[in-house]
């Protein structure tokens, strides 16, 4: 490893989609960071966007900081010390996520990336995630005038904690699995209606859905739809299974639960939540996790009644002045 300070290391700035080699480098570093920290440094949405490339709703800005070998030309250095990715929305706002390889921490790598980002893009409309609420991320955010604006709780239910209540579906509502090639448009409409208050989820496009369906983890059997006698989708529970790694067992996730406005107030949300958890438990998974905003008191209360406890938190940072 070079003793040179990171301020002298080359930073590759890529606007638009990344090539396969850079994506492999990002994926390998992210895996090393997750193994060290216990949390993935990138959200699933960011990885989906990186793999799928830019779309009509998202554009990309990526920065990669390479640590030059003492014997090599810095322009061709191979050691990726850290990277940053900004997913830009059509309205000009963006979300930053950043990762530093465990071998290169406490050397100013993150600061170099953020300084380069400030010079190349600026901070207008920019927010940032820290997955796992790391102290180093909080210090870096404060240095650049950012403060916490949102806290996303990761809650967990283990098999030993699980005493799920009976939660029958409402009358004239049945449950079935998502059928690829048939249900995409109907589900997108139901999702948009269910999350009209949550544009991050509600604005999902056919391309976004296709990208998720192309992921290795996608299994239509765990994508549960609640339908009325006419077949109309009233709600859904999309589950996910994270494969085991590094000696850790596979774990299930309450990926997203939604209920359309006309079906709310019937207990369908609770019934769908319980049905999805039972589906995951029947697959032999030792634990189930979910994400919810810390200030969503009704959701937190429901999940606690089901046996979930707070496990970790992700923190979003924004400018202190609200800019």
Swiss-Prot record:
Which residues belong to the signal peptide in this entry?
A: none
Residues annotated for acetyl-CoA 1 binding in this entry? 98-100
Sites binding 1D-myo-inositol 2-(L-cysteinylamino)-2-deoxy-alpha-D-glucopyranoside sit at 44, 200, 240, 253, 291
Keyword annotations for this protein, in alphabetical order, are:
Acyltransferase, Repeat, Transferase
According to its UniProt entry, one GO biological process term is: mycothiol biosynthetic process
Presence of the UniProt keyword Transmembrane in the record: no
Q: Does the keyword section mention Repeat?
A: yes
Where the record annotates domain N-acetyltransferase, the positions are: 173-323
Q: What is its EC number?
A: 2.3.1.189
Annotated function = Catalyzes the transfer of acetyl from acetyl-CoA to desacetylmycothiol (Cys-GlcN-Ins) to form mycothiol.
Subunit comment: Monomer.
Q: Which named protein is this?
A: Mycothiol acetyltransferase
**Gene name of this polypeptide:** mshD
């Amino acid at each position: 490893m070079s003793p040179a300070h990171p301020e002298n290391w080359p930073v590759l700035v890529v606007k638009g989609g990344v090539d396969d080699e850079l994506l492999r480098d990002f994926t390998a570093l992210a895996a090393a960071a997750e193994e060290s920290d216990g949390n993935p440094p990138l959200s699933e949405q960011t990885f989906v966007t990186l793999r799928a490339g830019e779309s009509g709703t998202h554009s990309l800005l990526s920065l990669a900081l390479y640590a030059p070998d003492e014997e090599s030309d810095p322009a061709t250095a191979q050691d990726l010390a850290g990277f940053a990715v900004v997913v830009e929305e059509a309205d000009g706002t963006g979300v930053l996520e950043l990762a530093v390889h465990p071998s290169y921490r406490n050397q100013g790598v993150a600061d170099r990336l953020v300084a380069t980002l400030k010079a190349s893009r600026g901070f207008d409309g920019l927010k940032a995630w820290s997955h796992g609420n790391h102290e180093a991320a909080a210090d870096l955010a404060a240095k650049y005038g950012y403060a916490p604006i949102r806290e996303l709780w990761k809650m967990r239910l283990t098999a030993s904690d699980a005493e799920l209540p009976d939660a029958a579906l409402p009358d004239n509502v049945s449950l079935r699995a998502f059928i690829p090639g048939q249900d995409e448009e109907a589900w997108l409409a139901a999702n948009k209606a269910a999350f009209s208050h949550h544009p991050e989820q509600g604005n999902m496009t056919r391309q976004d859905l296709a990208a998720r369906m192309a992921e290795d983890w996608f299994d239509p059997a765990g994508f549960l739809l609640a339908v009325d006698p006419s077949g109309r989708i009233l709600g859904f529970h999309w589950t996910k299974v994270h494969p085991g790694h590094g000696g850790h067992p596979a774990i299930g996730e309450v990926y997203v639960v939604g209920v359309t406005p006309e079906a709310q107030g019937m207990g369908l949300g609770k019934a769908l939540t319980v049905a999805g958890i039972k589906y995951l438990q029947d697959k032999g998974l030792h634990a189930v996790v979910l994400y919810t905003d810390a200030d969503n008191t009704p959701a937190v209360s429901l999940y606690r009644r089901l046996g979930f406890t707070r496990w970790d938190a992700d923190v979003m940072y924004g400018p202190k002045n609200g800019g």
